């Protein structure tokens, strides 16, 4: 690369690393918030520990499966769109979860006791399992983006820095939801979903603006040695990858 191209590549590389770090941290905002809201849901809604534990178990199982499924899908799609849309959908699932009491009350009528409680628990369970699946849209596109933008010889070092996004996201949501529950009391559990969801939805918009799928998307050459700089056509001849936006 010439000096100008190298500067542009460095800029986009840094931008991609920072954007994906922030984005992946926000996936934790709309997953780890559940545990912090649990005491409030027990007190305010009367949901049992058994139901809440079942939500967590199913969420974890579906999340594990979804990482495999989403990994396959992310390899075949634009990683920029995949990550941004996935985070936005996680945020919407959290918004819906926070409105579960209102949804069940509106559909079945307020104050009807057991039926409303069952409907609310079912709605919450569906939303949290759905969120578990959508959480799997976080890491696979990051892995794809980073391997396109970081040379193999730098990958271990820069991935070590990137991996702090897990701890940053989990730590910040503890502070945020801890403050919310301390300030609003048991009834503040809803805001443990609404506020992280609002932040994450805004973050999804930032991801869509900040990320680009590959270096060729911005007129830069692919990194040598990754195999991405060439592809085979029908005649098995090597040619440069076409530019993608």
Model-derived regions: residue spans:
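Extracytoplasmic
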Residues: 15-49
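Residue-level signature of mid-helix packing/kink "hotspots" within the transmembrane helices
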Residues: 32, 60-68, 136, 170-171
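Helix-to-loop junctions at the C-terminal end of transmembrane segments
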Residues: 66-78
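C-terminal ends and interior cores of transmembrane alpha-helices
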Residues: 88-117
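Cytoplasmic helix-loop-helix junction between adjacent transmembrane helices
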Residues: 127-167
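Helix-loop-helix hairpin linking two adjacent transmembrane segments in secondary transporters
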Residues: 162-213
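Flexible cytoplasmic inter-helical loops of multi-pass small-molecule transporters
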Residues: 212-245
């Amino acid at each position: 690369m010439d000096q100008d191209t190298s500067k542009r590549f460095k800029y986009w590389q840094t931008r991609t690393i920072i954007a994906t770090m922030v984005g992946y941290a926000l996936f934790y905002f709309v997953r780890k918030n559940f545990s912090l809201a649990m005491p409030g849901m027990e007190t305010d809604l009367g949901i049992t520990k058994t139901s809440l534990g079942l939500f967590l178990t199913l969420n974890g199982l579906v999340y594990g499966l979804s990482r495999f499924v989403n990994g396959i899908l992310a390899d075949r799609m634009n990683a920029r769109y995949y990550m941004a849309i996935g985070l936005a959908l996680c945020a919407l699932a959290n918004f819906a979860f926070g409105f579960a009491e209102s949804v069940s009350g509106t559909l079945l009528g307020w104050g009807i006791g057991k039926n409303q409680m069952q409907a609310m628990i079912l709605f919450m369970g569906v939303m949290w399992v759905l969120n578990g699946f959508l959480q799997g849209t976080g890491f696979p596109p990051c892995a794809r983006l980073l391997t396109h933008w970081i040379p193999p010889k730098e990958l271990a070092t820069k991935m070590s820095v990137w991996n702090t996004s897990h701890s940053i996201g989990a730590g910040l949501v503890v502070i945020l939801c801890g403050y919310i529950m301390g300030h609003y009391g048991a009834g503040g559990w809803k805001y443990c979903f609404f506020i992280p969801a609002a932040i994450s939805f805004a973050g999804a918009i930032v991801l869509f603006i900040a990320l680009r799928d590959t270096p060729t998307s911005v007129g830069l050459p692919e990194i040598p040695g990754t195999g991405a700089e060439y592809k085979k056509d029908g005649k098995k001849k090597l040619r440069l990858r076409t530019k993608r936006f």
